[in-house]
Amino acid sequence: MLRVRSHIWQQHRLLSLSLCRKNVQLSSSISNLFEKHNITVTEDEIKHDFNEPILTHLKRRGLVENCVNEEELIKDAETRKLGLYCGADPTAKSLHLGNLLPLMVLLHFNLRGHNVYPLIGGATGEVGDPSGRSTERSAMANNVRLDHINRISGQLSNFFRKATDYGKTRNPEIATLEIGSQELKNNKEWWKDMGMLEFLAIYGKHIRVNQMLSRESIKNRLQSEQGIGFNEFTYQILQAYDFYYLNNTYGVDIQVGGNDQYGNIVAGIDLIGRLRKAEESKNQNQSYGITVPLLTTSNGVKFGKSAGNAIFIDKALTSSYDVYQFMYNTTDEDIKRFLYKFSLLPTKTIDKVVDVHNTDKKSRFGQRVLAIEMCDLIHGDGEGFSNYIISEILFSKVNIKENFKADEILNAFDKQGLVSSVSKTDLASTNIVNLLYKINEGEKSKSELKRMVKGGSVYIGNTKEGKVTDAEYLIDIEKDAIESKLLLLKLGKKYNVVRID
């Protein structure tokens, strides 16, 4: 019955694709930039990605390093609805860019109708995963761990909600498809009532110590001077049981993780097989594992907390503007790789972006697209365009009136809390010195502001033609403001964005 429904779901997917228009309109967040460079997104580009087997597509995007039971998975993913999960332990306040790769795998499957179960390690986080570590993790206070759990749970939920909405703006077909379910889980749910004796009695006999000792992460720690504690040694058992529990309870078929999780994933698949045999289970569906590559730059630099260059997805830790600037500074060699991994633009469209970028690398067109895409993926559609506007005004010296609407500018700076307001009445009777004093809330004295005006450090707009040297100058709304709604003032290196009420 499940396979029949899945076949109908597949037919619906292909039928909806056939209804595409020749040229597809994307969100204004990215289409404005595309139009300037004559880039269009066509029906064929969208079909190309959606007609491709999901695993083949993910490999082409550079999101798959290894796959357990690959041939069976390729067939299964096209004939039935699967369940996938990946876990995140609460070792920090926020997920970071490196954590997004397994989430992107889940997202691609989810947008094609498969169910996903992002998992927060409320229980396993108390133990500590030794994978990829040469030393034992420091103990964490319980209240700190609970705070991390709450934060990361919210981040996981927000990511899938915002990324799904973002996907619909980059590929209109996504809006016509039946997207799979998204259900956040915490493994504390099934571990809190599990006693040690109960676990050993029921499951211990199905776990092989020789296999545990053969894991690379375990061997490395055993050979180290510090060794390994029993808590971290048994972590792989806990992760294996998580996979079994999710498989048995929610029909989760695939575990996704970093490449250092390969051994733990295989242990879970092995445990599922052993327990099914012991329980004489009628469920004969294959279980799978997918690992993602380590996220690095083209010159091999890692991303993450330990590397000291983590870009967090929590706005309180890394603002969306900082995300934009970080991606804007990406090297030319990394643009295609990162767009393939983190953007939901059709891959053929990405190829067009890269081709246009390569004709004039100094324009940094590719970096702008990447920065917009990353912001919209993490923080929601429109976030990237807002940061693009801010960046262009602050650094590119574009003609503001010709390139942006007043409402676009106000919205962009408002998101960063950088907009002041002044009434038309006050504006008409307030000279430039008093205006700057008011909107900067007395940050500088009036005498200091007067010296800056006379010294040529004050501009209206972002061009040299807007220099003001008369301390008694009164703003002319028709001449100085944008659409009579917005006034942009530059005081030294600082910009003031003023809404005219």
Residue map of PLM features:
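Serine/proline-rich low-complexity intrinsically disordered segments, especially terminal tails, linkers
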Residues: 8, 18-20, 29-31, 425, ...
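Extended hydrophobic/Leu-rich segments
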Residues: 8-9, 24-26, 30, 34, ...
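NTP-dependent nucleotidyl-transfer catalytic core
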Residues: 17-261, 266-269, 276-288
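Conserved nucleotide- and phosphate/pyrophosphate-binding catalytic cores
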Residues: 270-501
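Short glycine-centered helix-capping/turn motifs at secondary-structure transition points
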Residues: 13, 62, 80, 440-441, ...
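A broad, structure-centric signal for solvent-exposed, well-ordered loop/edge residues
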Residues: 8, 65, 71, 104, ...
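N-terminal chloroplast transit peptides
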Residues: 1-18
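An N-terminal domain-start capping segment
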Residues: 2, 189-191, 369
